[in-house]
A protein has these predicted regions:
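P-loop NTPase catalytic nucleotide-binding module
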Residues: 40-185
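Switch I (G2) and immediately adjacent beta-strands of P-loop GTPase domains
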Residues: 1-33, 47, 53-56, 60
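Redox-cofactor binding/interface segments in oxidoreductases and associated redox assembly factors
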Residues: 36
Length: 185
């Protein structure tokens, strides 16, 4: 457990190996959000899909964390595509690796900068499109104005997460700290 910006966060770290499945599944009953960590070097593994499915069946918010973005010989763009193929178009990046994976660029709250692949602006647009689909009035305003404020997106974002309409993908490096601050935000 730790405090972050006056919010108490409890992390339950469970094993991802099939041999320890009996230790991992009971934790799903005690959490609001299932954060599924994918090692960028290994990509999608057999248990990754199962954990995503089990979390969905329990109605949990799901978050996919791609770690080790700074490792050698990783194709993060291809990994993101595989994640979307495996778990659906609702898997959208909240940030994208930048500076040869030494940092990340925010795609939702304050989109700016470049990324190592893809366009931050395109990623932002896809996220906003996905979130506004949850609220008809907000969608109408968005279609009229072409943009909505972060304040207008707050409640629909939470609803999209709760309803599984959005599964955020966050790129991080535990080794260098890239993306960790953004993940906590």
């Amino acid at each position: 457990s730790f405090d972050f910006q006056e919010i108490k966060i409890h992390l339950l770290d469970t094993p991802g190996y099939p041999d320890f499945l009996g230790h991992a599944l009971p934790a799903l009953a005690a959490v609001e959000t299932a954060a599924i960590v994918i090692n960028a070097q290994n990509g999608l593994e057999m248990m990754t899909g199962r954990f995503v499915q089990w979390a969905a069946k329990r109605g949990l918010d799901r978050l996919i964390i791609v770690n080790k973005i700074d490792a050698e010989n990783v194709d993060l763009e291809a990994l993101l595509e595989r994640i979307q193929q495996a778990f659906g178009r609702e898997c959208l990046p909240l940030n994208l690796p930048a500076g040869k994976a030494s940092k990340v660029s925010d795609c939702f709250f304050a989109p700016s900068g470049e990324s190592d692949f893809s366009s931050v602006e395109d990623a932002h647009r896809k996220l906003v499109d996905q979130v506004v689909e949850i609220d008809e009035k907000l969608m109408e305003r968005y279609l009229e104005k072409g943009e909505v404020t972060p304040e207008e997106l707050h409640e629909p974002l939470e609803r999209a997460l709760r309803e599984g309409h959005l599964i955020p993908v966050v790129f991080t490096s535990a080794k260098t700290g890239a993306g960790i601050g953004e993940l906590l935000e």
